[in-house]
Each structure stands twice: as structure tokens, then as C-alpha cells.
């Protein structure tokens, strides 16, 4: 079943794949990495002016990585704002996605966390560096194929 936004994107010749609806009835779309920045700008102009959240996950060991964006169209006088979920899948060998920082500034720390934990590089992000782990940390801790390094914690140090 095609949702309202998917129908609008088809009407305007914008390539995407409908993934259906989640349990709350929110339309979910898959966008190719190379198309994401231009479609993000179009969605902003269309009225999706609020980025509720961005997260990322490892789909399967050795498989794809996904960056997920939850967008909301907030308008005055509307009790139930329109929401959409966008998923961008990338290869773990070269996980690069255009940053949407210049569209929604609120994605700043969220893209940095996705970079820090999964190694997804967000092109044109102004401050893409580790945010939770030390800069010297090797690897991407939330990848399913990540092997934790051997280290010993000093217990009861006073």
C-alpha cells in the first residue's frame, strides 16, 4: 500500500521505495544514499520542518548499515502532525551518506553518534568526530561484527 508522501514523490518523479507503515501507521520510505540530500531538501520545503530523531543500526553481521530519520510536518491549527520515517541503507565497506545538517540543524549530535558507534560517515557534516568514545578508540562498538578489545578496569581505586 502506497502512502500519501510516497504518492506525492512518485507524482514528482522522485525515486524511492515504499516500505509500508509501522505499527503506529507512520509511512516508511527507503531512499538511496546518493538521492538523500536532494530529497531531504524537497521534504523540508514540502513542510517536514522538524527532525524528531535520527539513529542508525547494523542490519546484519557483515551486511548493510542503516541510517533512520523520523520527520514531522508541523503546521499551525493541525492537531495530528504528519510523520514519515526515512531509511537510507549503505554498505559497511564504504558507509557514506550525505549529511542533512544544513537542512535540519538538530541532526548534529545524532549523526555524530551514528558515526561514533557504527562508522557511518556523513559527508559535509561540519564537525564529524567521535562524541562518546575517545578519539583514539579503534572500531565501531555497535556493529554486530565488533570485537571488544581486552582491557582491564581498575576496581575500587580511591
UniProtKB/Swiss-Prot annotation:
Keyword Kinase: no
Reaction(s) this enzyme catalyzes, per UniProt: a plastoquinone + NADH + (n+1) H(+)(in) = a plastoquinol + NAD(+) + n H(+)(out); a plastoquinone + NADPH + (n+1) H(+)(in) = a plastoquinol + NADP(+) + n H(+)(out)
EC numbers for this chain: 7.1.1.-
Chief place where the protein resides: plastid
Alphabetically ordered keywords of this record: Chloroplast, Membrane, NAD, NADP, Plastid, Plastoquinone, Quinone, Thylakoid, Translocase, Transport
Any single biological process term in GO: photosynthesis, light reaction
Protein localization: Plastid, Chloroplast thylakoid membrane
GO CC term, one of those recorded: chloroplast thylakoid membrane
Membrane topology (UniProt): Peripheral membrane protein
Gene Ontology MF term list: NADH dehydrogenase (ubiquinone) activity; quinone binding
Source organism, top-level taxon: Eukaryota
Gene3D superfamilies hit by this protein: NADH:ubiquinone oxidoreductase, 30kDa subunit (3.30.460.80)
TM stretches of this protein: none
Function statement: NDH shuttles electrons from NAD(P)H:plastoquinone, via FMN and iron-sulfur (Fe-S) centers, to quinones in the photosynthetic chain and possibly in a chloroplast respiratory chain. The immediate electron acceptor for the enzyme in this species is believed to be plastoquinone. Couples the redox reaction to proton translocation, and thus conserves the redox energy in a proton gradient.
Subunit: NDH is composed of at least 16 different subunits, 5 of which are encoded in the nucleus.
NCBIfam families in UniProt: PRK12494.1
Family: Belongs to the complex I 30 kDa subunit family.
Protein name per UniProt: NAD(P)H-quinone oxidoreductase subunit J, chloroplastic
Gene it is expressed from: ndhJ
